[in-house]
Swiss-Prot record:
The keyword DNA damage does not apply. GO terms for biological process: symbiont-mediated suppression of host innate immune response; viral process. Keywords: Host-virus interaction, Inhibition of host innate immune response by virus, Suppressor of RNA silencing, Viral immunoevasion. This is Suppressor of silencing P0. Belongs to the polerovirus P0 protein family. It comes from Potato leafroll virus (strain Potato/Scotland/strain 1/1984) (PLrV). InterPro entries: Virus_P0 (IPR006755). Residues 76-95 form the F-box-like domain.
Length: 247
C-alpha cells in the first residue's frame, strides 16, 4: 500500500520484497493516486510537484532487486550508499539514510537537507581517498610537492563527487514533469506481467534519458537497473585500450 503525506512524500506501510510485480503495481497505480490527492484531498500544485519529485526519486530504487521495503524505509545494500546520496541530490529529494550493518535504510518519512547530503558525500569520498592512499610512498607528509599534489587531488575528488544542482530540463517545469510521469506510467493491463514490466522500463528509461544526470549515467544504471543510455566513448574510460591510445 502506498501512502501520500501532506509534505508530498511517498511512504510504504507494508513489508515487500522488491519485485517486478511491486514495480508494476506502484508505477501503474501512481496516476490514480495523484488524481485522488488532487481532487479528493485538495493537494495544491506545490504538493503535487513534491510528490512527483519523490516518485521520480524512489521509483528507480524500487527496481533494485537487492533490496526490500520495510516499515522503517527502503533497504538497500550498503555499497550503494554513495550512489543513493548522489541520486537524492540530483532529484532534489533528501530522505535520511541510516547505515545498519551491511545495509542502508532510506527513511522516506524523515526528510533531511541537501546540505546534509553534500556533507555526507564529502565524508564518504574523503574516507575512500584516505583508505586508497594509505601506505603510499608519496603520502601527505613526504614533502611539500607531494602534499600539494595530494591536496589538489582531494579537492578535485570532492568537487567531482557533488552534483552542481538538481535535475534540470524535465524537472524545471511542473506541468511538463507531471505530464511526462503520467505518460510513462501508461501500460496495457491485459498483457502478461513480464511484458508490462518491460514496457514500463522502456517508458521510464526514455523519461530518465531526458534528464541531466551530470555524467552519472553509469552509476545510476548500476544502482537502479534502468537501461539508461551511456555515450559509447564512456565505455572505454580507464580501460587498457584507452591507455594505449593515449600513449
Amino acid at each position: 500500500m502506498i501512502v501520500l503525506t501532506q509534505s508530498g512524500t511517498l511512504l510504504f506501510d507494508q513489508r515487500f520484497k522488491l519485485s517486478k510485480f511491486l514495480f508494476v503495481v506502484i508505477a501503474t497505480g501512481f496516476p490514480l493516486l495523484l488524481q485522488q490527492a488532487s481532487l479528493i484531498y485538495g493537494y495544491n500544485h506545490e504538493q503535487i510537484y513534491r510528490i512527483c519529485r519523490s516518485f521520480l526519486h524512489v521509483l528507480p530504487l524500487l527496481n533494485c532487486k537487492r533490496g526490500r521495503i520495510s516499515t522503517s524505509g527502503l533497504q538497500l545494500p550498503r555499497h550503494l550508499h554513495y550512489e543513493c546520496l548522489e541520486w537524492g541530490l540530483l532529484c532534489g529529494t533528501h530522505p535520511a539514510i541510516q547505515i545498519v550493518g551491511l545495509t542502508i535504510v532510506i527513511k522516506l518519512d524523515d526528510p533531511t537537507t541537501a546540505a546534509a547530503y553534500r556533507s555526507e558525500l564529502l565524508r564518504v569520498s574523503s574516507s575512500s581517498y584516505i583508505q586508497n592512499a594509505a601506505g603510499l610512498s608519496n603520502g601527505w607528509g613526504h614533502d611539500m610537492e607531494a602534499f600539494v599534489r595530494n591536496a589538489i587531488c582531494l579537492l578535485e575528488l570532492r568537487e567531482r563527487s557533488i552534483p552542481q544542482s538538481g535535475l534540470r530540463d524535465l524537472m524545471g517545469n511542473y506541468q511538463h514533469l507531471v505530464r511526462s510521469l503520467l505518460d510513462a506510467c501508461k501500460v496495457d493491463h491485459f498483457v502478461p506481467l513480464d511484458f508490462q514490466h518491460r514496457s514500463l522500463m522502456l517508458n521510464f528509461a526514455r523519461l530518465y534519458n531526458q534528464l541531466d544526470l551530470q555524467g552519472r549515467a553509469k552509476s545510476f544504471r548500476a544502482l537502479t537497473g534502468f537501461p539508461v543510455y551511456v555515450p559509447s566513448e564512456d565505455y572505454l574510460e580507464g580501460s587498457f585500450l584507452q591507455k594505449e591510445l593515449q600513449e
